[in-house]
Amino acid sequence: MLTDKFLRLQSALFRLLGLELLHEQDVGHRYPWRSICCILSVASFMPLTIAFGLQNVQNVEQLTDSLCSVLVDLLALCKIGLFLWLYKDFKFLIGQFYCVLQTETHTAVAEMIVTRESRRDQFISAMYAYCFITAGLSACLMSPLSMLISYQRTGELQPKFPFPSVYPWDNMKLSNYIISYFWNVCAALGVALPTVCVDTLFCSLSHNLCALFQIARHKMMHFEGRNTKETHENLKHVFQLYALCLNLGHFLNEYFRPLICQFVAASLHLCVLCYQLSANILQPALLFYAAFTAAVVGQVSIYCFCGSSIHSECQLFGQAIYESSWPHLLQENLQLVSSLKIAMMRSSLGCPIDGYFFEANRETLITVSKAFIKVSKKTPQVND
């Protein structure tokens, strides 16, 4: 079935967290210890990073690195915490999407629409996940590599770690270093996994909502039946589907609204990453900062692009009404004509996805991109 591909990548990612998206409620938390370990690994690592920043207040590069790391940790904890807090609500919303898709994908056109949006969603989600995986792997592998290079040059083995942190023990001992390094890796996994899970879930639900709006638009343009009764039934179904799409969009916005506020943090993060990229332009750490910058840009782009697409698809329903075969209804049923007018007025409002202070749309993405470009131009001057 077409719905078998629903949330395929997202379900696999959430299983790594010990959570099930598409099963019954009683098996929702199949392995709760995974989520707990994920939270503890990040929460326990943050004090080490904060201590590193306090210890290097006079060093701008190291202080910036620690602030950036703390910001990422806080965002990851907020995401996994919010998802677990609203877990039942998210599962109910996912179940609603699944039921509507099952009901509405019995025609060839509907299948084509859902398949196209699903492929786009899985491609974007996979690319986003690969960026985080590349950033995490490069960070974890670069520190041992830097240690080996430094040892070949100086003959001394200095412990280095993927992320800024200080420890209450001597890492010159191999056993202590292994424990510290493993702690870094666990923290990296604890940050990347929930971040990718929640962001790709929003991406998938947004694309499926766009598909449902497109199906409603297609049915609106072909609502005419073989007789008056069938025509009325078709219109009734179209309006019900459109109302259901609006309802799904409302709940999607309500549940993800606190996360969309991350644009403020992401914008600050991009400014910090500009400095770090320029400071490490000829260093092995460049791969990590480049991949991580791509991941943060992808994160902002996902929310802005998906939010803009939902809003546009909702508004296009009014155009579908205008292009449909409605003139003959003027002579048959004036009440239906009034319903069409009301639907057109409602569609003009769209279905905005906002984060309290701003909307997640292309204009916001352009604003963030311009700020990123301006900071990129000024960064070389600061370094000089």
Curated annotation (Swiss-Prot):
Membrane topology: Multi-pass membrane protein
InterPro entries per the UniProt record, alphabetical: 7tm6_olfct_rcpt
Main location: membrane
UniProt topological domain (Cytoplasmic) ranges: 1-34, 88-128, 199-258, 306-329
GO MF entries: ionotropic olfactory receptor activity; odorant binding; olfactory receptor activity
Annotated transmembrane regions: 35-55, 67-87, 129-149, 178-198, 259-279, 285-305, 330-350
Keywords: Cell membrane, Membrane, Olfaction, Receptor, Sensory transduction, Transducer, Transmembrane, Transmembrane helix
GO BP annotation list: detection of chemical stimulus involved in sensory perception of smell; signal transduction
Keyword Secreted: no
Subcellular location(s) of the protein: Cell membrane
Keyword Membrane carried by entry: yes
Membership in a protein family: Belongs to the insect chemoreceptor superfamily. Heteromeric odorant receptor channel (TC 1.A.69) family. Or1a subfamily.
Quaternary state and interactors: Interacts with Orco. Complexes exist early in the endomembrane system in olfactory sensory neurons (OSNs), coupling these complexes to the conserved ciliary trafficking pathway.
Protein name per Swiss-Prot or TrEMBL: Putative odorant receptor 98b
Native source organism of the sequence: Drosophila melanogaster
Protein encoded by which gene: Or98b
